[in-house]
Regions:
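N- or domain-start disorder-to-order transition segments that initiate the globular core
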Residues: 36-74
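Metallocofactor- and cofactor-centric catalytic cores in central/energy metabolism, strongly enriched
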Residues: 62-69, 87-90, 95-99, 106-116
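Internal helix-turn-beta structural module
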Residues: 337-375
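Conserved, mostly hydrophobic/aromatic
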Residues: 85, 294, 360
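Conserved phosphate/anionic-ligand binding catalytic regions in large, soluble enzymes, centered on
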Residues: 81-91, 356
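Active-site-facing alpha/beta catalytic cores
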Residues: 40, 99, 112-277, 298-299, ...
Length: 376
């Protein structure tokens, strides 16, 4: 239309309709993007590492620990792994206290057992609600603060390593966050709800530490085995804004944690028959370094935390009387803290879990010595 030309009423109506349509579209897009509030830009993993570096002594000890752990998974060492600790690392003082107690026991069983403390700082939630771990809430009674969470976790990890020389295990709930702690962690677990996720599998393929794949809550072992196969293979994919390639992780392995059927009933999978079946499936797949860790809690114990003692003893008995199991079962995963059971956030009982119930210290110490007695 030429400048100064008049428009008809019909043209004006059509133009106004188009304007309203476009405005409505862009408004909807604006509302959609406004559902995300970009609160603040967080430091990159490298920036966090530069601010809170790993001292040379700790880095050397980590390398030594990693080498020994690798030998357990490749069969070069016959030491037995105990990945043990609280359901969630909720309090720095109590967690450090607990791990220092573990260090005393480790010294007494070091010829047979290699302990990796569970320092779980991310908690998957079935509905997405509730306490999500130290990453989200470094103080469980205060509002979420993810930046402070990253700093608190790194500080806790470094303090544990400095004061005990222990390696550290955590769950990889968010694959994009792994790089914040890749210079510290010595063992990573992929949870039952994450094991089917492609990004978890692909990132695991680029890690040079053991990654344990839990069976899904359904109990379908083929899903877990597919995850192990993916992790043991090389891939090209998008990660943290980079086009990356991985070579595969030959010490990715299985974790049996029990299952839940369609009626909500827990189905254990720690018995001899379950482990034997998994071994046969492993061999058929031709995976490198066949290995399994048995989780004594969760659906294996029906979350009856004291059952972990009986379950551990049964597994150790089977290992003692089966050469196949002796080479295949590399260790146990046990949920343990200072006090028995669990509590609600704010109850204030020192060293008591605020998530799943855990075995208390007295029972834990006794159980570790019992496990050592089973080992030749």
């Amino acid at each position: 239309m030429m400048p100064g030309a008049k428009i008809s009423c019909k043209q004006a109506c059509i133009g106004f309709y188009v304007y309203l349509t476009l405005a409505s579209y862009y408004y909807k897009e604006l509302v959609f993007y406004m559902s995300f509030e970009f609160y603040r830009k967080l430091p990159t993993p490298q920036e966090i590492k530069n601010i809170y570096p790993v001292p040379e002594r700790i880095a050397a000890k980590k390398a030594e620990n990693d080498a020994e752990i690798r030998k357990i998974f490749t069969g070069e060492s016959n030491k037995f792994l105990l990945i043990i600790g609280p359901c969630s690392a909720d309090n720095e003082e109590a967690v450090l206290d607990y791990i220092k107690r573990l260090a005393v026991v480790q010294e007494k069983v070091k010829d047979k057992i290699f302990i990796i403390p569970r320092v779980y700082t991310n908690k998957p939630r079935t509905t997405g609600k509730g306490y999500k771990g130290m990453l989200h809430q470094p103080d469980p009674e205060k509002a979420p603060d993810l930046l402070q969470g990253l700093i608190t976790i790194r500080h806790l990890f470094l303090k544990i390593m400095d004061e005990t020389d222990f390696p550290i295990a955590d769950e990889m709930l968010y694959p994009e966050n792994y790089r914040y702690f890749s210079d510290i962690l010595s063992y990573v677990a992929i949870g039952a709800r994450s094991v089917e996720n492609q990004q978890h599998r692909l990132v695991s393929s680029g890690m040079d530490i053991p990654v344990g794949m839990k069976n899904p809550t359904s109990g379908d072992l083929s899903i877990m085995l597919n995850s192990i196969e993916a992790a043991q293979s090389g891939h090209s994919f998008l990660y943290r804004g980079w086009d990356v390639e991985t070579t595969g992780n030959d010490i990715s392995h299985a974790i049996l944690r029990g299952a839940v059927n369609q009626y909500g009933q827990c189905i254990p999978n720690y018995h001899y028959e379950d482990i034997n079946q998994l071994y046969d499936m492993y061999i058929q797949k031709g995976f490198a370094n066949p290995s399994v860790i048995i989780d004594t809690n969760h659906s294996n114990s029906n979350k009856q935390y004291m059952e972990q003692v009986r379950i551990a003893k049964e597994i150790m008995h089977n290992i003692k009387h089966s050469d196949k199991m002796k080479g295949f079962v590399k260790g146990l995963m046990i949920e343990s803290y200072i006090e028995d059971g669990c509590q609600k956030i704010g109850d204030g009982v020192y060293g008591k879990s605020i998530t799943d119930p855990c075995l208390g210290w007295d029972a834990t110490e006794k159980l570790i010595y019992t496990i050592a007695d089973y080992l030749e």
